[in-house]
Regions:
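Conserved active-site-adjacent core of cysteine acyl-enzyme catalytic domains
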Residues: 48-49, 84-87, 95-203
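Bacterial Sec-type N-terminal signal peptides, specifically the leucine/valine-rich hydrophobic h-region
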Residues: 16-19
Length: 203
């Protein structure tokens, strides 16, 4: 009887030790796993910096021929409003439309169909509400966005869509961006698709 009781106590003690051990080890394992993942991401970002350190920023030229209509126009308005909200500033659609004036294109019913902008127009507009900084290289832009900054840019080979860069997917080698027309904050674009980026900070 005493032996049976002793066995029960021994089994209970082993189980208790096992539970305590698991509880003690788990946070360390999670921390190690998290640290390992962070290190991998940092290594991938470093590779991207090296790859793009000599790549210039792609921009439009300040000529009439280089002027592109930003289709729909809502993407420019949405990008500016998103940046405003990021800095707790409420920028109304009417305020933005008034600023662009005759650059705003409308249909016969008065609906906005686009906004015609070149690089100077784009830069001036962003600096009207924010401090818009020209990144001197692709690597610099990638680094700033990866470290929490945001940037407005024009997307695609026709430069006809305005979006806000929010982050970097180091695994895919792409920017993560907000799109006011398509919706969502998890859209992705290749670095080569980005034109006229401006790093946005509060004035």
């Amino acid at each position: 009887m005493k032996l049976k009781r002793l066995l029960k106590i021994t089994v209970f003690a082993c189980l208790l030790f096992s539970v305590v051990s698991c509880q003690n080890d788990s946070p360390e394992e999670v921390m190690y796993s998290k640290t390992s993942m962070e290190q991998q991401t940092e290594q991938k970002l470093q590779c991207l910096y090296e790859m793009y350190k000599d790549k210039p920023i792609q921009s439009l030229f300040n000529t009439t021929r280089a002027t592109r209509e930003v289709l729909n126009g809502e993407c420019v308005i949405g990008a500016i409003q998103y940046c405003g909200n990021h800095f707790n500033e409420n920028i109304s659609k009417n305020e933005i439309v008034r600023y662009f004036g005759d650059k705003v294109q409308r249909d016969r019913n008065g609906n906005i169909t686009g906004i015609v902008l070149n690089t100077s127009d784009w830069d001036a507009a962003l600096n009207n509400w924010f401090t818009a900084t020209y990144p001197y290289s692709q690597a610099y832009l990638i680094n700033e966005i990866a470290n929490g900054k945001i940037a407005c840019c024009r997307l695609g080979s026709d430069r006809s869509h305005a979006v806000v860069l929010l982050g970097v997917d180091a695994d895919a080698g792409k920017f993560i961006y907000y799109d006011s027309v398509l919706g969502g904050e998890n859209n992705k674009a290749a670095f080569t698709e980005i034109y006229d980026p401006r790093i946005i900070t509060k004035k």
